[in-house]
Amino acid sequence: MQKSRNYYRKAKHVRILKKLKSNREDKQKYRIGIYKSLRNFYAYIFDPWKNKVITSVSTLDKSNGYKGNIVSASSLAPDLYKKMKKLNLENESYIFDRGGYLFHGRVKAFANALRDQGVKF
């Protein structure tokens, strides 16, 4: 039986997380994680000490037609930045965890929009 694309993506994500956990400096940085489905896009901020989600945004919150495109993914960045400001996390340094996805399309658009807001990763 042939293994699926998601199986390999998850295996890649596990390898990336293992490298992050082995580096002492990266253990103390907040992590911005993403998940994308065919219809929606999700972004989370993880606490480095408890490894729990602090806040999240998704295209489920917005009520515009099709939400699985580049425009809607990049429009989530200002929403996430507003939530960072509420939690006084805008001056922290972050790790961008792409979740095993390739850095193009929606992932790249979201990351560039976050960088435009002033988030450092």
Curated annotation (Swiss-Prot):
Lineage of producing organism: Bacteria, Bacillati, Mycoplasmatota, Mycoplasmoidales, Metamycoplasmataceae
Instruction: Check the record and name the SUPFAM superfamilies matching this protein.
Output: Translational machinery components
UniProt family annotation: Belongs to the universal ribosomal protein uL18 family.
Q: Does the keyword Hydrolase apply?
A: no
Domain of life where this protein originates: Bacteria
Q: State how it assembles.
A: Part of the 50S ribosomal subunit; part of the 5S rRNA/L5/L18/L25 subcomplex. Contacts the 5S and 23S rRNAs.
Q: Which Pfam families match?
A: Ribosomal_L18p (PF00861)
What is the name attached to this protein's record? Large ribosomal subunit protein uL18
Gene Ontology CC: one annotated term:
ribonucleoprotein complex
Q: Which UniProt keywords apply?
A: Ribonucleoprotein, Ribosomal protein, RNA-binding, rRNA-binding
Organism this protein belongs to: Mesomycoplasma hyopneumoniae (strain J / ATCC 25934 / NCTC 10110)
A single GO molecular function term of this UniProt record: rRNA binding
* InterPro entries associated with the record: Ribosomal_uL18_bac-type, Ribosomal_uL18_bac/euk
Q: Which GO terms describe its biological process?
A: translation
Question: Briefly, what is this protein's role?
Answer: This is one of the proteins that bind and probably mediate the attachment of the 5S RNA into the large ribosomal subunit, where it forms part of the central protuberance.
